[in-house]
Amino acid sequence: VCNLSAQPDQTASYLHIPVVDLDQDIARQVIVDREDGQYLGHPTTVLLEDGVTILAVYPKGHGRGAIVYRKSIDGGKNWSARIPVPSSWAASQEVPTIHRVIDPLGIKRLIVFSGRYPAKLAHSEDDGATWSELEPVGDWGGIVVMASLIPLNNGKSHYMAMFHDDMRYLTVDGQQAYDEDRKTNNNALFTLFKTLSVDGGLT
């Protein structure tokens, strides 16, 4: 989703993005989670190789908040209760993302990222039955880190992940850099970053 600031008469000739509105199609909607007075949203999911098992993670809050973890074994028609997770997941500061990766030895792994500074990573080697604690990936951070992760076409189980930041979370003093930049620039500069893994997502 993007925000286009051009005038309607300048964009009408080429911006014809089809819209599919399922708001009233209740038969196709599934309530995965609900809690009175609590914002729940921003889920990311991964479909396992059986084609029906879906794992979902999302924050208990708007962006930041404890990571909630749930599972469906029927393609998303029904969902488990909230599944217990390691204690460090309660301190997540950004929307978590979940991905399937396979290392050069053929070991299948699931990884969950949590953003802001420093970016953190947890992993599972039993299809999400158990997880490690969230641990820093490096001396950097970002907003919704690793929203996109793709395998590189080199046959070596290498991956590229991408994220963006507006100065605030890339470094330990990012907020200070951001505040200084606002004194001379009206709008924040968002920068796209990439990071590579050659060990099946562990680093």
Language-model-detected regions and their locations in the chain:
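C-terminal segment of classical bacterial N-terminal signal peptides
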Residues: 1-5
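Asp-box/BNR beta-propeller blade signature and adjacent active/binding-site loops
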Residues: 7-203
